[in-house]
Amino acid sequence: MKKSYWISLYLKVENQDNLKKYAEVVTPIIKSFGGVPLVRGGKFETLEGETYPRTVIWEFPSHEQAMKCHDSKEYQDGWALAKDTTERNLQIIEGFSTE
């Protein structure tokens, strides 16, 4: 089974406190669907294209699990804490097998 990756590119964060509350609430929810955090902010360099002030990447055991997590009521309730003061692009991308 191929893993899938949840990639959030934040375009604008108007309220850091709301984003922090969102992260605190949704982290255990995402983990309950098998999500593993790979990138959460941190030092970065923009070498080409647009700069995003924050990037978050989660790894999931499958595309289906990533979608179930995103579509769950629990996650959507958590996202409601930040969505009015945050603008982001979110993609769920299936990885490839190296075997």
What spans do the regions from the language model cover?
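Short S/T/G/P-rich N-terminal loop/turn motif that feeds into the first structured element of a domain
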Residues: 1-54, 61-71, 94-99
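C-terminal structural segments of small proteins and small subunits
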Residues: 67-69, 74-91
